[in-house]
Every structure is written in structure tokens, then in C-alpha cells.
Amino acid sequence: MQRQLDRLHRQLKLTQAQEAAWAQFADTTLGNVRQIDDLYKDRAQHFEAMSAIDNVKNYQTIIQREAEGLGRRAVALQALYDALSPEQKQAADRFFRYQEERREQRYMARHSG
């Protein structure tokens, strides 16, 4: 995720005045990633001992935390996006569109056939 953030930061060519909004967005994004990574690591450590219901409830917790994190990320992204110039907004739109296309391609490669 850090590489993606670094790439987006370079593409946006932010001004000094925009850096605070960027820092909030990047910190929120990385905090969310760390939280979910920790939850999956904990899940892996306890997976063998989980009952079927524990498994589903644990996964539900992870998905809920992902959704909460996505909400925080959306708020931080909105603040950043509002500070961008029209050209920077276009760059951000392209970046996120490209990321989503890649995610869809990976999903389809795993689930087709």
C-alpha cells in the first residue's frame, strides 16, 4: 500500500498547502491496512481451533472493521479531494479507476473458469 500511496503522491504533485490533507489521508489509509493485517494475523494464529461459527463470526468482525476503515478513508479522501485543483482531481480519478480495474482483473483471474 505504501508504494501505491507514494505513486499517487507523485502523480498529484501536491502543493505545500495540500500536504496536511494528504498526510491525513495517507495516515488513515495505512492505519486501516495495519489494523486489517493484524486481524488477519490473529485469525491465522487461531484458525485451527475455531469452530465453524467462530470462523464466520471472526470473518464478520474483519469485514465490519474493513467497512469502518473504508468509511474513515472516504472522509479523509474527501478532504484531500476538495483541496485538489481540477487537474489533480483528474489524476486522482485516473489513479483510483486504475486501481479498481486491477482489483477486478485479479478477482476475475481467481474466480473464472
Q: Where are the model-predicted features located?
A:
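Charge-rich (acidic/polar
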Residues: 1-113
